[in-house]
Structure formats: structure tokens, C-alpha cells
């Protein structure tokens, strides 16, 4: 971090939720004992303890938010968040991104398409109102101001990586056209 700190911020990727295409382990928060017991309270405690440990090392932490309730429990410890390729087209996740209090990267679709993430960026950067959880833990109407730090993450797709110069230029042109 000392060497690159003026141009690059290194963060620890700490993913607690596992998006599933079909079935399987859903991650530390949902199943910390890896046995299907779904001890959510234990998983949330473990996630917070791990994040506090990372922060105690002086390293910012990042995660992918999958369940829209999870940010209420760990967002205060997260410096950068992601909305994944499997959820970028979800209205729920776009609305959630609009209210996150940290920069959020929205990934292109699993097939590599950019239009879904461009649509998601427009939604995430604008005010939203939706059914959610208040700071007091009560179901309520949540209103956001939009996330001015929402941005695109090129994560590749069916045709391979998309972080080469041509792919980045295409993404940039599509973003400029959408504005």
C-alpha cells in the first residue's frame, strides 16, 4: 500500500454470501458451520469479527452484497461493495445499491453483456424508494438519494475476459451514450 497508495487502493476481498446458479453452500453468513444448519446469528457475528480483524490490520474491506438485508449488519465495516453478475438485473439489488454508503461496483452480466449493467448504473445512481429494513431493524419504506460512486466492473463473460483496451473503449462509449 505504501508503494502504490497515491494511485491505487488495495482492499481485502471478503465475500460472505455465495450466489448460487442452482443449489449449494450459500456462504459463511447463512451457514457458518458448513453443515446446512443455517445458523444466521453465528454467521453474522463471525462476519463482523472477521471484518473487524481486517480493519484492525489497516486494510479496507470489500464484499459482494447478495441478500438485501445483509448491509444492515455489516455495511459499517465495508469500504467497497459489489453487485454481482447474477443479480445486476435485479430491481431489488439496483435499489439497494442506490442506498449503500460506499462506492459500489456493478458487474456486467454473466454472458458478458453490458446493457444490463448500464441500466443498473442508471438506477443505482438515482434516488429510489422501496420496501426495506430501517436502521432500527423494522420493515419500512426506505428512500435513498442515489449512489454517486456507482461504477461498472468488467468481469468477463462467455467469450472470455473483457478488460482489454477495445472492450474498455466499447464500455466507455456505451456509458457516455447512456448519459
Regions found by a protein language model. Name each.
Residues 1-2, 178-179:
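Short acidic catalytic loops
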Residues 3-174:
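Active-site-facing alpha/beta catalytic cores
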Amino acid at each position: 500500500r505504501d508503494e502504490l497508495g497515491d494511485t491505487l487502493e488495495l482492499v481485502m476481498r471478503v465475500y460472505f454470501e455465495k450466489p448460487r446458479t442452482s443449489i449449494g453452500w450459500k456462504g459463511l453468513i447463512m451457514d457458518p458451520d458448513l453443515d446446512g444448519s443455517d445458523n444466521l446469528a453465528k454467521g453474522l457475528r463471525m462476519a463482523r469479527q472477521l471484518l473487524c480483524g481486517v480493519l484492525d490490520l489497516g486494510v479496507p474491506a470489500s464484499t459482494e452484497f447478495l441478500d438485501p438485508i445483509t448491509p444492515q449488519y455489516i455495511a459499517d465495516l465495508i469500504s467497497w461493495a459489489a453487485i454481482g453478475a447474477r443479480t445486476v438485473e435485479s430491481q431489488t439489488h439496483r435499489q439497494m445499491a442506490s442506498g449503500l454508503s460506499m462506492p459500489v461496483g456493478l458487474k456486467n452480466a454473466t454472458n458478458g453483456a453490458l446493457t444490463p449493467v448500464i441500466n443498473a448504473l442508471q438506477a443505482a445512481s438515482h434516488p429510489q424508494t422501496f420496501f426495506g429494513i430501517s436502521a432500527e431493524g423494522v420493515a419500512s419504506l426506505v428512500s435513498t438519494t442515489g449512489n454517486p460512486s456507482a461504477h461498472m466492473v468488467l468481469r468477463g463473460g462467455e467469450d472470455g475476459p473483457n478488460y482489454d483496451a477495445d472492450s474498455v473503449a466499447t464500455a466507455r462509449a456505451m456509458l457516455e451514450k447512456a448519459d
